[in-house]
Curated annotation (Swiss-Prot):
InterPro entries: DUF5317
Signal sequence interval, chain numbering: none
A single cellular component GO annotation: plasma membrane
Lipoprotein as UniProt keyword: no
Record's subcellular location: Cell membrane
Protein name: Uncharacterized protein TM_1467.1
Length: 168
């Protein structure tokens, strides 16, 4: 679903002309954005998944002045914590999987009873108009909102004139 959200937000930013604003930011630690996704594909998930989320969190925190990144950081922390306490996999509520007729992939594990370890798991069903179905978490929702804020909202750069009247 992240790809869908990213592409929709990117398309909206192109259509609204806000894409030029996305390119103006001075990103810190940009390498920390790509590496975590590679780490999650490797074995040793109990170690590498938490490490990957720490790297993402650092990237978002170092760039917290960029609109949307704080929400993405919070969502990443929630998802990273949930995956970390569940052996490096995101738990998905089995009844929702059955409802949507979905199979698990290598990054997910099914659960049937809620506990403190599954409180922030994937249990929210999502149907997209083009036929794709997903189960998402509260952390995912925060990340998605952050992505839309980042791509779609017009940022306020420091080079803009101040709105505070000057005293004479």
């Amino acid at each position: 679903m992240m790809i869908d959200v990213f592409l929709i937000a990117l398309l909206l930013s192109i259509l609204t002309g806000n894409i030029k604003n996305v390119l103006k930011y001075n990103y810190k630690g940009l390498y920390l954005f790509a590496i975590p996704f590679v780490l999650q594909l490797l074995p040793w998930k109990e170690i590498l998944v938490p490490l990957s989320f720490v790297m993402l969190f650092l990237f978002f925190i170092w760039n917290r002045n960029i609109p949307g990144f704080k929400l993405m950081a919070i969502g990443a922390v929630l998802n990273g914590f949930t995956m970390s306490v569940n052996g490096g996999k995101m738990p998905v509520w089995e009844p929702t999987l059955k409802l949507l007729n979905l199979d698990l992939d290598f990054k997910h594990t099914a659960f049937t009873e809620f506990s403190w370890k599954t409180l922030l798991a994937d249990y929210i069903p999502v149907y997209l108009p083009w036929g794709r179905k997903f189960v998402i978490s509260v952390g995912d929702i925060l990340v998605f909102i952050g992505v839309f804020i980042f791509f779609v909202l017009k940022p306020r750069f420091q080079t803009q004139p101040s709105r505070v009247p000057h005293e004479s």
